[in-house]
């Protein structure tokens, strides 16, 4: 069953007098916060691209990664604006379709990020075979995850939160992760292998920058898994939204990675002189 339910995205000014709006004000604030903070991805991606261009960095794969990150931001805005986050289990709603587009680009961005790190670490002729095997493996994981997502949306018409959510529907009321979301995490995990395998080959400053990026991403992942999109946490007198924090910390990770890429490129140029 297909149910398209796009409605106007309202501002704080006209949310209450608008007829037909069934969402609570807290839910509206949560989704509105998610929309606004989501643009941090785009800003960080654009700033990152500008930094790499100014530094005349020629590594095309990082530009592709940042470009995907900026597009992912736009698709995520659509995810949070579709009918204020409404899901109906068993119904192919606009929100569910929006989540498909959003999750697809999230997975593609994660895949591109892992591939970029692999291409960064394995550049010598001796490591090309290892790099290609790694890229094929990560790409296979990406295809599997997108297949699972497609099954969830277009066959099940639902994305239950099996991990940490007890199988609850993806309605933003509880924390937890769906199969495709867990698959996205699995897609990113090979980065840990890349870091461990190349840790001693990096300079001290490269290591610390990368450790910072991984640490921030880990904190962001834990925070967003604890609360649903519609939940306003009790922290800070009810002014804390977990998913919005995920957006902002994710944007911070983007910039940290850009600084790491620039530092690594600069170190190589200095060593070649």
What role is predicted for each listed range?
Residues 152-163, 186, 200-208, 212, ...:
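Alpha-helical transmembrane segments and terminal signal-anchor/GPI-anchor hydrophobic tails
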Residues 272-273:
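Non-transmembrane, juxtamembrane loop and terminal tail segments
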Residues 90-195:
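Membrane-proximal helix-loop-helix units in multi-pass membrane proteins
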Residues 59, 171-174, 194-203, 207:
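Alpha-helix capping and helix-coil boundary motifs
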Residues 2-126, 130-131, 146, 207-211, ...:
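Early transmembrane hairpin module of multi-pass membrane proteins
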């Amino acid at each position: 069953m297909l149910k398209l339910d796009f409605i106007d995205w309202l501002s704080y000014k006209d949310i209450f007098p608008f007829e037909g709006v069934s969402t609570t004000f807290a839910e509206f604030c949560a989704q509105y916060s998610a929309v606004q903070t989501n643009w941090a991805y785009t800003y960080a991606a654009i700033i990152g691209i500008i930094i790499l261009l100014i530094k005349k960095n020629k590594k095309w794969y990082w530009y592709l990664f940042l470009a995907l990150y900026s597009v992912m931001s736009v698709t995520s805005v659509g995810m949070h604006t579709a009918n204020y986050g409404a899901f109906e289990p068993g119904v192919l709603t606009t929100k569910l379709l929006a989540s498909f587009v959003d999750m697809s680009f999230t997975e593609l961005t994660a895949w591109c990020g892992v591939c970029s790190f692999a291409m960064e670490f394995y550049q010598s002729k001796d490591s090309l075979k290892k790099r290609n095997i790694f890229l094929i493996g990560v790409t296979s994981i990406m295809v599997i995850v997108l297949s699972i997502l497609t099954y969830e949306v277009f066959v099940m018409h639902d994305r239950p939160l099996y991990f940490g959510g007890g199988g609850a529907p993806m309605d933003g009321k509880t924390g937890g992760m769906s199969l495709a979301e867990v698959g996205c995490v699995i897609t990113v995990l090979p980065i840990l292998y890349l870091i461990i395998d190349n840790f001693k080959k990096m300079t001290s400053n490269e290591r610390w920058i990368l450790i910072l990026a991984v640490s921030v991403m880990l904190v962001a992942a834990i925070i967003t898994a604890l609360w649903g999109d519609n939940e306003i946490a009790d922290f800070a007198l009810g002014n804390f939204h977990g998913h919005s924090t995920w957006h902002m910390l994710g944007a911070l990770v983007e910039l940290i990675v850009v600084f790491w890429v620039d530092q690594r490129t600069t170190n190589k140029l200095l060593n070649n002189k």
